Amino acid sequence: MGFSENGKINGIKIILLSNGGNVLDLSGPVMTRALTHLDNCYSFKNFFAKGYICKTNTVSNTAFRGFGGPQGMLAIENILDEISKYLKKPLNDVRAINYYNKKNGLKTPYGQLVKNSKLQKILNEIEKFSNFSSRFREIQTFNEHQIKNGKSLRKGIAMMPAKFGISFNKPSLNQAGALVNVYMDGSIRLNHGGTEMGQGLFIKVAQVVAECFGVTLDKVFLSPTNTSEIPNTSATAASSGSDLNGMAAWNASKVIKNRMEDLVIKLSLIHISEPTRLDGI
């Protein structure tokens, strides 16, 4: 790693090693996400990163939330922290001089353009709203007093930016399916490929369908997730469950709604340019 006196990183090389356990499982995608989050919120003119998955004698475990993202961000944040200590400069100042912006560059190491970044504005507002600077000084004074008096209790405060990728690294996984049935009594049965695990996904997708048909939520009935109904589903992960399954349900609902509108016009004795809807029907 090379950096200037003001803390700007001019070039960096990072090698990641992960404990893959005795079988591969999801170690590959986890490493991919770690590699694509090594930049976090920072632009680097010269950047090289490589990841190795190590086969070990430990039991393999599947991935959980974060999926490599926090590990990648932790690596670069640790590097910036070391630069801050070496130069005796405030960590947030070292971060700020490396942020994605027009001067430093807006393209990630993997070629994606960082558009409409409001990072500096958001951080400034958070710092002001939280009184971060004054609280930092108070804590610093407290810790110095504790050290002076030989006491072990310490306090801490931190503020760290984060850039996290939404959706899957593999494009083919960014898809979903839904099955919508409308019955003679006006009730709607909905199947989709998402998994409800307490995050409220089912109610969100049901709200999408109710909105599309213009009916109240109690008209929509959800069936449990079942791959015999909706095959080839992607995992409910990568902060994509609502977007993918919600849009699949919306598209399916629009197809049926358009058919219903055409049928209303076809069965009418007079020409209707715009069907009149009562309670969404």
Question: Which positions does each model-derived feature cover?
Answer:
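Glycine-rich loop/linker segments at domain edges
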Residues: 1-78, 165-175
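Acidic, glycine-rich active-site loops and adjacent beta-strand->loop/helix elements
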Residues: 16-21, 48, 100-103, 163-165, ...
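Short acidic, glycine/proline-rich loop/turn micro-motifs
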Residues: 26, 106-109, 192-193, 232-237
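Alpha-helical support elements that line or immediately flank enzyme active sites
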Residues: 29-34, 63-93, 98, 167, ...
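Short, surface-exposed charged micro-motifs
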Residues: 41, 177-181, 212
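Flexible glycine/proline-rich, aromatic-decorated loop/lid segments
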Residues: 50-52, 217-241
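Helix-loop-helix junctions that connect adjacent transmembrane helices in secondary transporters/permeases
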Residues: 99-187
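Single conserved hydrophobic/aromatic residue that forms the stacking wall/gate
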Residues: 270-281
